[in-house]
Every structure is written in structure tokens, then in C-alpha cells.
Regions:
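Active-site glycine-rich loops that stabilize anionic/oxyanionic intermediates
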Residues: 2, 9-13
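Conserved alpha/beta-hydrolase
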Residues: 15-47
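Alpha/beta-hydrolase active-site loop
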Residues: 52-73
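Alpha/beta-hydrolase fold nucleophile elbow
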Residues: 73-85
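Alpha/beta-hydrolase-fold enzymes
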Residues: 82-170
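Short beta-strand/loop motif that positions the catalytic acidic residue
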Residues: 187, 193-195
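Short alpha-helix in the alpha/beta-hydrolase fold that links the catalytic acid
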Residues: 189, 203-213
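Catalytic active-site module of serine/aspartate enzymes centered on a nucleophile-bearing elbow/loop
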Residues: 223-269
Length: 269
């Protein structure tokens, strides 16, 4: 095997959505691990009402736990990670990333609606994140995300913290209880960042507002137009099988290069 890749999902997106991509990686020599955050998909309890979970728990407990498990299970292999949207946040926030050879961030950005160009979409996102979502979380104990276009239903605590961060100028970097700036400063592994011209949320400015905090590592940016991809990608499309021939090979090549570099460093040592 070339290495092991942990796939960190987006908000409200169950791991099954990444099945085709995980299979693609596995066929090219990577052990690939997918998982669900607490309260989502296979990690959802029978009832989400008053289920205790915050968005930071997805990063500091779930993402970190899976990455540490991968390291313990495959100690001889290069450790790599792919993060989709909030999955990229999780990698930057958790501590286990110190042992990672490289990370790919796909459509990862700060969740500030001010970066959304379309006025109608900006208002819709603000209404959901800072209004309807937190209100429903407090009233019924969870957020019916499927009805609001947020993917899966969300634990109430996740929605409340998400809404609070969305109201901060620098998103969670302004939350003094999280220490996000210090956490991102600790990242020293190379980072590859994908953005898409037709993504209404992860605009170049929103991506920059996140990646600027990787101050101690090398960040490579790839901004893709629909014509280059062979179709509309948006915020959620990268992991669809239709892009297996156009978008996925470049990502896999980068992971392979990072895995090879890590093996070479180990031999030299």
C-alpha cells in the first residue's frame, strides 16, 4: 500500500457519499477510511433531540480519534487526509494532524456569509445559520437539516455553535475558547487546496480567509472552472463519480507524491 487516507466529511454529509471516491483511492493503493461525525449517518442515535454534540466535537474528538486510530492501525504507512468543507476545518483544529504527511482540502472555507457573492443566497444562508437553525435547535433540540437544505439533520449543539461562529468576523478564529489560530499555526504538513469557480460558498476570498492561518506550512491552491472539470462542481460535486476521470487523478497523484516523499525521508533517517 502507498499509505492510508482518512476522509473527513462535510457538515451533514454521511460517509456513504464518499464511497466511490474511497474505492477509487483503494484501487490505487491507499487504505481509505471513512466515518460519520457524531449525530450523522451511522453515528446518529435513535433520537437527535437534546443529543449532546458541538461542532468542535467533530474536530477535537471525532476527527482526531479516527486519525489516531489510523496511525495505531497502520503505523508503518504514510498518513494522509482529505477534508471536505468542515472536514478541512477538523484537520486544522485537531492535534493528530502532526503525524500527517499531507492534507487535501476540498471546498474548505470560513463560514462567513459575507463572502457569498449572490445576495439571495447570502441572505438564505444567514437566515438558516444565524436564525432558523439555532432557533429550531433550542425549540425542538435538533435541526431538520434535510428540510433546510443542510444535508442530514443536525444535532442542536452543532447548529448553535455553527451559528455563533458564522456571526464572528473571522469565523471560529475569533472564538477565544477554541484557540483556532494557535491550532492552525501548529500545522506543518503540506496542504493542497481545491476551490471551484461555481461554488457559491467557498469563494476564493472565503478560502483565503481559512488558508491564511496555515502560517507554518506550504499551501498549494488549485482553482477549477466547470469547463476544466467537465461539468458543474459547486460545493458538493467533487466527490461524484462523474469526476473520476477529470478531477480525482490530480488529487491522487499529489497524495502519491506525498506518500513517496515520506517513505524516502524515513529511509534517509
Amino acid at each position: 500500500p502507498q499509505g492510508v487516507v482518512v476522509m473527513h466529511p462535510a457538515t451533514g454529509v454521511p460517509q456513504r457519499i464518499y464511497q466511490a471516491f474511497a474505492k477509487f483511492l483503494a484501487e490505487r493503493g491507499f487504505h481509505t477510511i471513512t466515518y460519520d461525525y457524531r449525530g450523522i449517518g451511522a453515528s446518529r442515535p435513535k433520537s437527535l433531540r437534546r443529543f449532546a454534540a458541538r461542532m468542535r466535537d467533530w474536530a477535537l474528538l471525532d476527527a482526531e480519534g479516527v486519525m489516531r486510530w489510523a496511525r495505531a492501525r497502520y503505523p508503518e504507512l504514510s498518513q494522509l487526509a482529505v477534508g471536505h468543507s468542515v472536514g478541512g476545518h477538523a484537520i486544522g483544529l485537531c492535534s493528530a494532524d502532526w503525524d500527517v504527511a499531507g492534507v487535501v482540502q476540498v471546498a474548505c472555507h470560513t463560514g462567513n456569509s459575507r463572502f457569498i457573492r449572490q445576495r439571495g443566497e447570502r441572505w438564505r444562508v444567514e437566515l438558516i445559520l444565524r436564525g432558523v437553525g439555532p432557533l429550531m435547535a433550542r425549540l425542538i433540540g435538533y435541526v431538520p437539516g434535510k428540510r433546510l437544505g443542510l444535508g442530514e439533520d443536525l444535532p442542536g449543539g452543532v447548529a448553535i455553535e455553527w451559528g455563533a461562529w458564522a456571526g464572528m468576523q473571522r469565523y471560529f478564529f475569533d472564538d477565544p475558547t477554541l484557540g483556532a489560530i494557535e491550532r492552525f499555526n501548529r500545522v506543518t504538513h503540506p496542504v493542497l487546496v481545491y476551490g471551484f469557480d461555481d461554488d457559491p460558498w467557498a469563494t476564493p476570498a472565503a478560502i483565503n480567509a481559512l488558508t491564511m492561518h496555515f502560517t507554518n506550512t506550504w499551501v498549494e491552491r488549485r482553482q477549477i472552472a466547470p469547463a476544466q472539470a467537465g461539468g458543474a462542481v459547486g460545493h458538493m460535486g467533487f466527490f461524484r463519480a462523474q469526476f473520476a476521470a477529470t478531477l480525482w487523478p490530480g488529487l491522487v497523484d499529489w497524495l502519491s507524491e506525498r506518500a513517496a516523499a515520506t517513505r524516502a525521508e524515513a529511509v534517509a533517517a
